[in-house]
Amino acid sequence: MPMWVMLVSKGGDMGIGSEEKPGCDSASAAPQHVLMLPGLDGSGSLSTPFLSALQAHGLTTQAITLPAQGGQDHATLAQRLWSQLPGHPFILLAESFSGPLAVELATRHPTGLRGLVLASTFARRPVPLPAASAALLSPAWPLPPVALLARLLLGRWRTREHMSMLRDALVQIPAITLRQRAAATLRVDVRALLSAIEVPTLCLHACHDRLLWPPSVAELQALLPDARHVSLEGPHLLLQARADAAAAEVAAWMRTLSP
């Protein structure tokens, strides 16, 4: 399989897309707000069903759109997104590409951060390729067909609706930006930062993830021994294919947290 096909399938101007639903009041025993960092596409448009499922549990939700211009490495993105983190209590949730980005942000100890959720993600390159391979992600390479991406990302859980959402998400972002982010996944390594995470952490793993190299998943589990690790039946795009189940896990875990 071409390297670009392996990488791009992991998964505008800076902005925030949000969906709100009234939750519990400030006297609640646990945080009620979830701030989401989306996957490789960076738009958050693929996450609408999952955010709606969280809202059904009485939570408020917000998805940050990753900036499409400028450096796309995780450290640079973390610096640019820092000012968008709220001062009130919140849970930071990140999937796939944004996992290392969330780690970068969490270890800077935001005032309102009360917990971290990492879904279908990694601490360093998620495929068995050397970091130097990032230079081979030529801008001239074409994007893989949506049908192929859907098979890799969603497997037997793919539907026409999923394929339509995936197609719409990909056309919103410049191809060069997708390639830059894919290259960043080969260079990133936040393993040394994991021990600096000071908030409760939940890790959601997909049992049928065709994108993440199994050793990278095992490594994350080993380096976060105090986190709650939950494996769900589903593909790499776990939050899209199993939105209700994933939201239920997140909501139940959040109820165990201190204010």
What does each model-found stretch correspond to?
Residues G15, E20-G70:
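Conserved HGGG/HGGXW glycine-rich cap/lid loop of the alpha/beta-hydrolase fold
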Residues A94-S98, A102:
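Gly/Ala-rich beta-loop-alpha elbow adjacent to hydrolase catalytic centers
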Residues T107, G112-L143:
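Flexible "cap/lid" loop of the alpha/beta hydrolase fold
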Residues L129, P144-S195:
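Conserved alpha/beta-hydrolase catalytic His-Asp/Glu region
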Residues I197, C203-H205:
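Short beta-strand/loop motif that positions the catalytic acidic residue
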Residues V199, W213-A222:
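Short alpha-helix in the alpha/beta-hydrolase fold that links the catalytic acid
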Residues H208-L212, L237:
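Acidic catalytic loop of the alpha/beta-hydrolase fold
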Residues G234-A247:
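Catalytic histidine-centered segment of alpha/beta-hydrolase-like enzymes
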